[in-house]
Amino acid sequence: MGGEEESDKPKVSPSPLPFRRWKGSWPTAERGRQRRSRGFRAPSRRPSQPRRSDDGGTDVAAPSRRPLPVRRGAGQAARGRAAQSREPREAGATPWMQSPRFSPPPPRAEPPACTLRKHKTNRKPRTPFTTAQLLALERKFRQKQYLSIAERAEFSSSLSLTETQVKIWFQNRRAKAKRLQEAELEKLKMAAKPMLPPAAFGISFPLGGPAVAGASLYGASSPFQRAGLPVAPVGLYTAHVGYSMYHLT
């Protein structure tokens, strides 16, 4: 009997995929409520640690991502290879390539920046002179270009100016008079230079040159033919002309 019952039951083929066997009783609703009331949390699984199955086997853990080790000597080796590849090129350079004619020009040095003169911070503001003060100063300068200390004190008090202002004005006026005098001397030198006659006065024509040319134009049979007049060369009078022009200047 027992054999027949076993033969009547369908045989279940074993699953090719592995499965985990569950140990313990199935979770019920009451047990779930107890866990929630206790604040139970499912343990978090770390990818770096292998997971253990209930049947004692271990699952393959996911490989942890770690940065690849950096080789310190790789950069130095690459730089060394680049330097070695440059050396034969430099050694094989021809002399005309190394000549300064074909080499690039050196970079030009920039000119230094122009530094402006800075005025003093405690510089006093410039006080403009009135028209009456300028006329009095100019009149005094024409009388006397250098004032003594007593004259300067008296003159400055009469114009309601300080002695320093009068002193500086006279210094500037003397410098201006010197510049004007030098300009006048330069003009006199330019005017005193003798004016040389131009080169056209030295050109001499052959005797009877223009007359001969006129005769050839009209021809021998022309009724309007005129006798040729001798023309003296201009070069004979160049000395007299130059002498008269020199004295005229």
UniProtKB/Swiss-Prot annotation:
Residue ranges, annotated region (Disordered): 1-125
GO molecular-function term, one example from the UniProt record: DNA-binding transcription factor activity, RNA polymerase II-specific
Which residue stretches does the UniProt record annotate as biased composition, category Basic residues?
116-125
Concerning InterPro entries, the annotation shows: HD, HD_metazoa, Homeobox_CS, Homeodomain-like_sf, Msh_Homeobox_Regulators
Q: What domain of life does the UniProt record list for this protein's source? A: Eukaryota
Q: For bias kind Low complexity, which ranges apply? A: 71-83
Q: Which residues bind DNA?
A: 122-181
Pfam families in the record: Homeodomain
A Gene Ontology biological process in which this protein takes part is:
ossification
CDD domains xref list: homeodomain
Say which family it is in.
Belongs to the Msh homeobox family.
**Function, as annotated:** Probable morphogenetic role. Acts as a transcriptional repressor.
Q: What protein name does the entry list?
A: Homeobox protein MSX-1
Q: What species was this sequence derived from?
A: Gallus gallus (Chicken)
Tell me the gene name: MSX1
